[in-house]
Amino acid sequence: MRCLPVFIILLLLIPSAASAAQPETKDDAALASFYDNAKRTLQRHWAKSLCCPEDAWCCSHDEGK
C-alpha cells in the first residue's frame, strides 16, 4: 500500500515528460532568445550597481557591448 501514492505520482508525471521531449518551435526559440537578452541586460546592470561612485572607471569598460 505504501507504493500506491508513488505509483500514482509517477503516472501523473509521464504526460508532462512527453511534452518536455517535444522539439522546440519557432516561438520557443524566440522566447529563449528574449530570456537570454533579458538575462544579459540584468547582469550588465547588476555589475554596474556594484561599482562605487569613486570607482566609476570600473563601469565604463562595459559600455561598448
UniProtKB/Swiss-Prot annotation:
<keyword id="KW-1015">Disulfide bond</keyword>
<dbReference type="InterPro" id="IPR031565">
    <property type="entry name" value="T-conotoxin"/>
</dbReference>
<comment type="similarity">
    <text>Belongs to the conotoxin T superfamily.</text>
</comment>
<feature type="propeptide">
    <location>
        <begin position="21"/>
        <end position="48"/>
    </location>
</feature>
<protein>
    <recommendedName>
        <fullName>Conotoxin TsMRCL-04</fullName>
    </recommendedName>
</protein>
<dbReference type="GO" id="GO:0090729">
    <property type="term" value="F:toxin activity"/>
</dbReference>
<keyword id="KW-0528">Neurotoxin</keyword>
<keyword id="KW-0027">Amidation</keyword>
<feature type="modified residue" description="Glutamic acid 1-amide">
    <location>
        <position position="63"/>
    </location>
</feature>
<keyword id="KW-0732">Signal</keyword>
<keyword id="KW-0964">Secreted</keyword>
<keyword id="KW-0800">Toxin</keyword>
<dbReference type="Pfam" id="PF16981">
    <property type="entry name" value="Chi-conotoxin"/>
</dbReference>
<feature type="signal peptide">
    <location>
        <begin position="1"/>
        <end position="20"/>
    </location>
</feature>
<dbReference type="GO" id="GO:0005576">
    <property type="term" value="C:extracellular region"/>
</dbReference>
